[in-house]
Amino acid sequence: MRTPYLLASACTASDPAARYHQAELAIWDELTGSLAEYPRIWRSPEEGAMVLAEEVDELWDEIRGNHIGRARAEASQVGAMALRFIADLYEPDGPGGAVERCRAAAAEQHDAMALVGPRGRQCASSHEAFGYLKREFDALWSAIRFDEPARPIAARVAAMAVRFIAEITTSSTAVAVSVR
């Protein structure tokens, strides 16, 4: 995985809005790489959700290990798979091919930014940010399970991945956790 956008979004001295744009670019890089490496369109919401679940689990593993740089990289993969969920399952015959399908999904993610995470403030820690992301993923799985619209929820998962990347740039204050 390439990380120039992840490095740029970690720069807290720059324009705060630029961090979100750089996070979106990191997700776009992951998405285009995924399309090149795995061009087959997903066949069901269940398939897409389980690919996304794998990335969510890998993100949690990095957070638990306090590997913030790697967690941000995993968050870009979560965002990419959430966008791919929309592009593959809801725009499979869209005009312009895969890139245009993905641009439509990215626009939905951008529009969902104000709907996710804590209102009026940044995420306090990687654990909190993951909690919000996991809540959106759980809502996605619930929508699939009960045959409800999943597309807008997938956009919310991607939007929360953007917030994770943009807002979690260093190791957060240690969170008390049980060690086994």
Which residues make up each language-model segment?
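Flexible "arm" and connector segments at domain edges
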Residues: 1-180
